Amino acid sequence: MVRKIFQTNAELKDWLSEQNSAIIFIPTMGGLHPGHQYLIQKAKERKTNTNQIILVSIFVNPLQFSKGEDFKKYPRNINRDAELAFSAGADAIWAPDYDEVFPGGADSHFKIEVPKTLHNQLCGAERKGHFDGVATVIIRLIKIIKPKKLVLGEKDWQQLIIIRKLFQELSIPVKIESYSTQRDQSGFAYSSRNSYLSDSERVNAQSLPNAIKEAKTEFDKGKVINLTKIASIFKENNLKIEYLKIVDPFSLKETENINRLCLLAVAVKCGSTRLIDHTFLMHRKPIIAIDGPAGAGKSTVTKAFAKKLGFIYLDTGAMYRAVTWLIISNSIDPNDQVEIKNILKDSKLEFKSSSFVEQKIFINNIDVTEKIRSPKVTSMVSEIAKQQFVRELLTRKQQVIGNNGGLVAEGRDIGTAVFPDADLKIFLTASPTERAKRRALDLHKRGYEFSSIEDLEKEIKERDKKDSERKIAPLKKAQDAIELVTDGMNIEDVLKELIDIFRSKIPEEVWPTPNS
């Protein structure tokens, strides 16, 4: 493909009409640096097919600059920017003039007003109307380009949160993909405004990333972050603090709940140059809880999700099935709690795997991976799972496995009982009819006979009733869970939806997507 630079809407639209391709759009204001190049490189790496084009825009948006800010001074060098963009993998560049983006002037077009609860935090507290200008221009660019995907950096975290919220509320059908802050060898976050710094200012400004890195290191050791100490370091290096806060990464409001994902956010002035930086604070790796009724496809999808994102996969349903199989194989009455306690007390339950795909479950060194999927186990597992001793035993085992995080678990009470502090909770469900069809396919594939889909649907409804009405850890959607109804969706569709939800809650900086 011949690399192109367009300056008018007409040129761009003519070219787009010839491509018949999905557009991956990366908006910039120019002044490109390795951070921008990283976004382009990642967008290229994660193309889902060859029929996708990476378009980079270069437009210094006057609406996001207040009076007295650096609009006129902002770096502009289209030739250098084009060279950096193309070398990173961009297919085309759109560098429009103001009149191309706002024909007749900005006053001739609708403007977006960001909710004050989001705008007036952090950067927006000092930069009045800044994010209104950002949101307005993004909508204009999206309207002109009509991309399938928008790629943004996590360095401008507040901007990312606002744009995600904007797209969600306006139901804009564009996927947002974000990537972590990139830094030079000294740890300094790349920014177009870094070029403003004199040599001596650059030395002073180095205390910004150094202090943030040290604070995160102390936090990871279990120590309390001392904001006063950080402020004194900045003062010693002639950095004027605009804000220095620990905030909730989504509401952007100050928080003292450091048991959840937090953001240490900083903005300082070094001379006349404004610099921002941040780091995420988390006591452990993320835990993802996926709950839902029988036959909703939890195991298949959760396993694929774990593989795609590099998580440990914990199939809690398989654990209950393994215990049920053990009880059946030893001819124990499912209501004889004394015998059940005795046999489980000395039993060894473990997962073994050489890969995510080949994960197997063993009980007392017997591979029961296939045995636990039999109709006999299926019909009895709910009776066994409702017993207090069984649930307490397996819940403890599950919590030990998830002690350090980095895990995705699926079951019926993961988000409510096993990991109530999970970082993301999904309630995956489908209609009983849909689940019966899936169950029939699964039984057929495994070589088991069944009477009819209608009977399977009846069994599923009975299982739902038992699971929902049991006194101990009943099946229910956690209050803070996101419900995903999967009727009519294939595994790939559900997986994509789950990953999008995950990325809206867990930044790349916290949990990077593994390279394929």
UniProtKB/Swiss-Prot annotation:
Keyword Transferase: yes
A GO MF label: CMP kinase activity
Pathway field: Cofactor biosynthesis; (R)-pantothenate biosynthesis; (R)-pantothenate from (R)-pantoate and beta-alanine: step 1/1
Residues the entry annotates as binding (R)-pantoate: Q64, Q159
Organism (species): Prochlorococcus marinus (strain NATL1A)
Region of interest: Cytidylate kinase: 280-516
Region (Pantoate--beta-alanine ligase): 1-279
Record field: catalytic activity: (R)-pantoate + beta-alanine + ATP = (R)-pantothenate + AMP + diphosphate + H(+); CMP + ATP = CDP + ADP; dCMP + ATP = dCDP + ADP
Enzyme Commission number(s) from the entry: 6.3.2.1, 2.7.4.25
Location in or out of the cell: Cytoplasm
GO cellular component: cytosol
InterPro entries: Cytidylate_kin, Cytidylate_kinase_dom, P-loop_NTPase, Pantoate_ligase, Pantoate_ligase/cytidylate_kin, Pantoate_ligase_C, Rossmann-like_a/b/a_fold
Family to which this protein belongs: In the N-terminal section; belongs to the pantothenate synthetase family.
GO-annotated biological processes: nucleobase-containing small molecule interconversion; pantothenate biosynthetic process; pyrimidine nucleotide metabolic process
Gene it is expressed from: panC/cmk
Active site, UniProt feature: H36 (proton donor)
Protein name: Bifunctional pantoate ligase/cytidylate kinase
Described purpose of this protein according to its UniProt entry: Catalyzes the condensation of pantoate with beta-alanine in an ATP-dependent reaction via a pantoyl-adenylate intermediate. Catalyzes the transfer of a phosphate group from ATP to either CMP or dCMP to form CDP or dCDP and ADP, respectively.
Residues reported to bind ATP: 29-36, 153-156, 190-193
Keyword set, alphabetical order: ATP-binding, Cytoplasm, Kinase, Ligase, Multifunctional enzyme, Nucleotide-binding, Pantothenate biosynthesis, Transferase
Binding sites annotated in the UniProt record for beta-alanine: Q64
